[in-house]
Amino acid sequence: MALVEIFKAILLGIVEGITEWLPISSTGHMILVDEFIKLNMSAAFMEMFFVVIQLGAILAVVLLYWKKLNPFTFDRGVSVKQETIEMWFKIIVSCIPAGVIGLLWDDVFNALFYNYQTVAVMLIIFGILFIVIENYNKGKRPRVNHLSQITYTTAFMIGIFQLIAAIFPGTSRSGATIVGGLLLGVSRTVAAEFTFFLAIPVMFGASALKLLKFGFNFTGPELMILLIGMVVAFIVSVISIKFLMGYIKKNDFKIFGWYRIILGVIVLLYFSARTIIG
């Protein structure tokens, strides 16, 4: 396998690790990156790769938040942390909309909406939403300042926003759920953390489905490319998550909104020009 393919896998892992957690759409960036950095692999492998590489990103969440995610303590025998168990139930409730609809209609939605026009439009729409919501919430105190204060109703409503991201590429799963949280009165840090945790079952489920569809029939180079991408995505995700949590403790999400709008315009102009030129 050529070194250039390894370098491409590293670049794709970096893009995944950054864009999966910042609310700027990993799909939007992957579409652009794939336009210029194409791995010399089959179309079936690349479809699977762009989803399963997320396992590296999700393992970063598990590592960084293990104490909050683990419902068991072993100080004096095994005991259960009721608050953590309840949080997991809320995560499950939040996953229901995207989980059910995604399983039934995933291929249909991909066929209808997986194109640069949808990606560009959703980048811009949710970019505007971030700016509008942050301006609206300016000076207001959030109602939810701890994960335990998220109700089952709020969790389900955040799940509806995740469903929007599942249907329309370019929305950004993290962007949609954070927007949903902010609209529902959840603080920035809690909305971000809940988004991270919500990704665990979603990404594991999506990766499992893609692996089953691919059939685990890896060649040696394919397996190496996938592992390299996942490891790099894991390392970069750790850095990205720490950066985001530090940033939003002192700042709002408007900078990400402006970035999304600019990127959406770039995607729209670039692919429109390419289509016209042929």
UniProtKB/Swiss-Prot annotation:
Pfam families referenced in this protein's UniProt entry, alphabetically: BacA
Intracellular or extracellular location(s): Cell membrane
Entry EC number(s): 3.6.1.27
UniProt enzyme class: hydrolase
Catalytic activity: di-trans,octa-cis-undecaprenyl diphosphate + H2O = di-trans,octa-cis-undecaprenyl phosphate + phosphate + H(+)
Gene Ontology BP annotations: cell wall organization; peptidoglycan biosynthetic process; regulation of cell shape; response to antibiotic
Transmembrane regions: 2-22, 44-64, 85-105, 113-133, 150-170, 189-209, 223-243, 253-273
Membrane topology: Multi-pass membrane protein
Gene Ontology MF terms in the entry: undecaprenyl-diphosphatase activity
GO cellular component, one term: plasma membrane
Alphabetized UniProt keyword annotations: Antibiotic resistance, Cell membrane, Cell shape, Cell wall biogenesis/degradation, Hydrolase, Membrane, Peptidoglycan synthesis, Transmembrane, Transmembrane helix
Alphabetical list of InterPro entries matching this protein: UppP
Annotated function: Catalyzes the dephosphorylation of undecaprenyl diphosphate (UPP). Confers resistance to bacitracin.
UniProt record similarity statement: Belongs to the UppP family.
PANTHER family assigned: UNDECAPRENYL-DIPHOSPHATASE
Miscellaneous information on this protein: Bacitracin is thought to be involved in the inhibition of peptidoglycan synthesis by sequestering undecaprenyl diphosphate, thereby reducing the pool of lipid carrier available.
Name used for this protein in its record: Undecaprenyl-diphosphatase
